[in-house]
């Protein structure tokens, strides 16, 4: 999925910003969180987050749910490079595995599992 944030900000500017953030806040991870384009779920009010390194994916999902005021009975899925990350994984480990070359971790969210059942292991 194409990132609007990437489209709106040149690579060098994004990279410099991510480096500045990582130097100033060594225990935080710069995250860009955007809605999957065709999803009918609410659009988030801000895209850029400074996430504590020890936060789990599940805790981050909780933050997103609150920001978009999603009712408890509604589903939300988050994706990192079109894959569902494990809920118990630390954001720091997801960052190390999937950070973009500009230094940000890009996460998308949707009200439906738009990429299918990607958490199965492929043999």
Swiss-Prot record:
A single Gene Ontology CC term: autophagosome membrane
Location, primary (coarse class): membrane
Alphabetically ordered keywords of this record: Autophagy, Cytoplasmic vesicle, Lipoprotein, Membrane, Protein transport, Transport, Ubl conjugation pathway, Vacuole
InterPro entries, sorted: Atg8-like (IPR004241), Ubiquitin-like_domsf (IPR029071)
Superkingdom of the source species: Eukaryota
Lipidation (Phosphatidylethanolamine amidated glycine): 116
Record field: transmembrane: none
Site (Cleavage): 116-117
GO biological process, one term: autophagy
Propeptide regions on this chain: 117-123
Keyword match Lipoprotein: yes
Xref: PANTHER family: MICROTUBULE-ASSOCIATED PROTEINS 1A/1B LIGHT CHAIN 3-RELATED (PTHR10969)
Protein name: Autophagy-related protein 8
Organism: Pyricularia oryzae (strain 70-15 / ATCC MYA-4617 / FGSC 8958)
